[in-house]
From Swiss-Prot:
Annotated organism of origin: Bacillus subtilis (strain 168)
Gene Ontology CC annotation, any one: plasma membrane
Coiled-coil region: none
The gene coding this protein: ktrB
Protein name in the entry: Ktr system potassium uptake protein B
Superkingdom: Bacteria
Keywords: Cell membrane, Ion transport, Membrane, Potassium, Potassium transport, Transmembrane, Transmembrane helix, Transport
Subunit structure comment from the entry: Homodimer. Part of the KtrAB complex formed by an octameric catalytic ring of KtrA and a membrane associated dimer of KtrB forming a potassium channel.
Length: 445
């Protein structure tokens, strides 16, 4: 299979990383053109704002330069909803589904692309995974929309309430963070139905499809794969730490939790603890948060959620591998062991490569925005981390960005969605060498 795969790669004009990058780019362009149509907007929309909105939706980020609820018509909002769905599940998923509907055979080249898009270790079973993934996603979005409609239909009426329910269900499951309301979800800060449904959706979408299918298949923690164990325990621990941190730091802040009842404080702390790694919805004003909370949120946005999910960031498992490897080194151990499993050296190197490349991209983004924007440094840093993690949280800078600033954020969102290594591999040529050079000594630390 390896030999056959190498032959196919040589035959294909573009490598899988290049196809993924080009596919996302073309989706963004088509989306921008659709959003500029008169039928899509209530008032004229500039090309850069259309491009930014399409990029934000396709990369499932959620940063917005215009108000989604008032700037766009139902048609325009439906286009955004479609871009979110394509961006969340991956355009290759929809391409394969279309080929299957047309009754055509899916070749090895297409299977390789799906493998790359879904970040799967092997090529076997990827088409079956696409079918299950699509049906599972649509089912959970429709069920969630029905539950949300119980709360929203009485408030907005049948047509608007049902549409808002579907829009927010799709936006949440795909970790987009787009909302039809100017204050996002701040009006529902203490609403149990909205809080539970929305967080369930973006945690489910962000934990990764591989983990979900593993849990549904095996059901017992002992039989889960190492990846699933890391994701479940890491998610629970990080969410608990984040909730406690937000609750303590913002408890007396009059701009966030200070004016809320204790129950609403807990709901808001929970919501804002889990949203930075995935979705980008907010029930509190991030522009009013204390600097300590903002800095902690930067870490959460950079970590992100799970591999093979609708979220971005360096991924939680990457963070865990690096952290445990450092701890193992400091304790004088030669191996990194997690849950009685040794982590292979190439995995550790890949985790380091992802992290260092990501930090470099974020640094370049911050550097560029400090040149183009006249804004407080912390706002620039926050917006850059949010764009790279495709989170969508903002301290209020995004609507005020210059044209150059919007272009920079678009590029960062794009790289964050396809992944830093995929982006680099789409340009770089990988060469294997059989030459073994002698070891050299380098002083570090």
């Amino acid at each position: 299979m390896t030999l056959q795969k190498d032959k196919v790669i040589k035959w294909v004009r573009f490598t899988p990383p290049q196809v993924l990058a080009i596919g996302f780019f073309l989706t963004i362009i088509i989306g921008a053109v659709l959003l500029m149509l008169p039928i899509s907007t209530t008032k004229p929309l500039s090309w850069i704002d259309a491009l930014f909105t399409a990029a934000s939706a396709t990369t499932v980020t959620g940063l917005a330069v215009v108000d989604t609820g008032t700037q766009f018509t139902v048609f325009g909002q439906t286009v955004i909803m479609g871009l979110i769905q394509i961006g969340g599940l991956g355009f290759m998923t929809f391409a394969v589904l279309i080929v299957m509907i047309l009754g055509k055979k899916i070749g090895l080249k297409e299977r390789m692309l799906v493998q790359e898009a879904l970040n799967q270790p092997t090529i076997g079973g990827v088409i079956g995974l696409v079918k299950v993934l699509f049906l599972f996603s649509i089912s959970i979005e429709l069920i969630a929309a029905l539950i949300l409609s119980i709360r929203l239909v009485p408030q907005y009426g049948w047509s608007s309430g049902l549409f808002a329910s579907l829009f927010h269900a799709i936006s949440a499951f795909n970790n987009a963070g787009f909302s039809l309301w100017p204050d996002n979800l701040m009006s529902y800060v203490g609403d149990p139905t909205v809080n539970l449904v929305i967080t369930f959706l973006f945690i489910t979408g962000g934990i990764g499809f591989t983990v979900l299918f593993d849990v549904m298949k095996n059901r017992r923690f002992k039989t889960f794969s190492l990846h699933t164990k890391l994701m479940l325990t890491g998610t629970l621990m990080l969410n608990a730490i984040a909730m406690l941190t937000v609750f303590i730091l913002e408890y007396s802040n009059p701009g966030t939790l200070g004016h809320l009842h204790i129950v609403d404080k807990l709901w808001a702390s929970y919501f804002q603890a889990v949203t930075p790694r995935t979705a980008g919805f907010n029930s509190l004003d991030f522009g009013s948060m204390r600097e300590g909370t903002i800095v902690f949120t930067l870490l959460l946005m950079f970590i992100g959620a799970g591999s093979a999910s609708t979220a971005s960031g360096i991924k939680l498992t990457t963070f865990i591998v690096i952290l445990t490897s450092v701890i193992a080194y400091l304790r004088g151990k030669k191996e990194t062991v997690i849950f009685r499993r040794s982590i292979k050296y190439p995995i550790i190197i890949k985790a380091l490569a992802v992290s260092v490349t990501s930090l470099f991209i974020v640094f370049l983004g911050i550097f560029a925005l400090t040149i183009t924007e006249q804004a407080p440094f912390l706002q620039i840093v926050f917006e850059t981390f949010s764009a790279f993690g495709t989170v969508g949280l903002t301290m209020g800078l995004t609507p005020e960005l210059t044209t150059a600033g919007k272009c920079i954020i678009i590029v960062i969102m794009f790289i964050g969605r396809i992944g830093p290594l995929t982006f680099v591999f789409s340009f770089a040529k990988t060469e294997q060498s059989n030459i073994r050079y002698p070891d050299g000594e380098v002083f570090t630390g």
